[in-house]
Amino acid sequence: MILTLTLNPSVDISYPLTALKLDDVNRVQEVSKTAGGKGLNVTRVLAQVGEPVLASGFIGGELGQFIAKKLDLAGIKHAFYNIKGETRNCIAILHEGQQTEILEQGPEIDNQEAAGFIKHFEQLLEKVEAVAISGSLPKGLNQDYYAQIIERCQNKGVPVILDCSGATLQTVLENPYKPTVIKPNISELYQLLNQPLDESLESLKQAVSQPLFEGVEWIIVSLGAQGAFAKHNHTFYRVNIPTISVLNPVGSGDSTVAGITSAILNHENDLDLLKKANTLGMLNAQEAQTGYVNLNNYDDLFNQIEVLEV
C-alpha cells in the first residue's frame, strides 16, 4: 500500500473562455471542479496503474467534504484529518491559449491540529510500504513539518518520495532524516544551491553531488522536453525522451512521481524506474485532464525512452 500526502489540497475549478474580458462580465458554458493538489494527482495516477493507494492530508468544511466525495466516486481510499478551517479553492481561467490562475492560500493549521495529524499519520504508517509527499505546506505549520514526517518513516523503514521546493525542501535536506527520492526540476535544483542555471552534464553531476544532498538515495532532475538527469547513490543517468504532442503539461510532474513511487514499491531496477516515471509523465501531458494517463499508449512510449549511464 502506498500512502500519499497532500497537506494543502484544493477544489480546482476550471473556467474555459473564448476570451477573458477584464472589468466586465464573463459567462462560462462549462465548469470543471475536481479534487486538486499535487498529491491527489499522484494518487489518481497510482490508482490508474493499479497500485493500492491511500490518500491523506488536511481537509475542512464543505470543500473538504467535496474532495472526499470526489475520491469516493473514483473508488480511491482516503483517510484525511479534519480541521476547523475551510479547504481552499484554486481557479484556472483558460483563455486564448493561456491560463490565468487565482490560488487561495488555504486554511491555517493550529498547533493542536498539527500534532493531531502526526499521531494520525503514525497510525497510517503501520500499514503502508511507501509514502509520497507532494506540494506546499499550509499556513501555520513549522517549516520542518515534512522533516518530522520523514523521521517517522525512516524509523519504520518506509521509503519517502518527496516533491516540494524552495525553503521547505531546503529544510528537509538540512535535516538528518532524508527522503529516499527528491524530484526537483533544473531551476529548483540550482536555486537550492544558489548557483546560476547550467544544463551541461558536468555541471549537473557536480550539482547533485553537493553535500546538501548527502544521504538522499535518488535525485531525479526534470529537464522538461529534454528528459531527465538522475543520480542513484553513486551512479548518474541521462534520460532521453521522444518528442510528443503536448496537450496539457499540468500534472506531468505528479504523474512522474507516481511512476517513481510505483517502481520503488515494486523494487524495480534503475532502468525501469526511470522509464516508468518518464512514460507516465509524458502520458499525462498528452491528455487534457490533469492527473490522467491513457495506458493504451504506455508500451509505445516506454520503449522509445533511452536511459544512459553517464
UniProtKB/Swiss-Prot annotation:
Alphabetic keyword roster: ATP-binding, Kinase, Lactose metabolism, Nucleotide-binding, Transferase
Disulfide partners: none
Known EC number: 2.7.1.144
Cellular component GO terms, alphabetical: cytosol
Enzyme type, top EC level: transferase
PROSITE patterns per record: PFKB_KINASES_1, PFKB_KINASES_2
Pathway this chain belongs to: Carbohydrate metabolism; D-tagatose 6-phosphate degradation; D-glyceraldehyde 3-phosphate and glycerone phosphate from D-tagatose 6-phosphate: step 1/2
GO terms of biological process kind: D-tagatose 6-phosphate catabolic process; lactose catabolic process via tagatose-6-phosphate
InterPro entries, alphabetized: Carboh/pur_kinase_PfkB_CS, LacC, PfkB_dom, Ribokinase-like, Tagatose/fructose_Pkinase
Reactions catalysed, as given in the entry: D-tagatofuranose 6-phosphate + ATP = D-tagatofuranose 1,6-bisphosphate + ADP + H(+)
Signal peptide: none
A GO molecular function held by the record: ATP binding
Family: Belongs to the carbohydrate kinase PfkB family. LacC subfamily.
Protein name: Tagatose-6-phosphate kinase
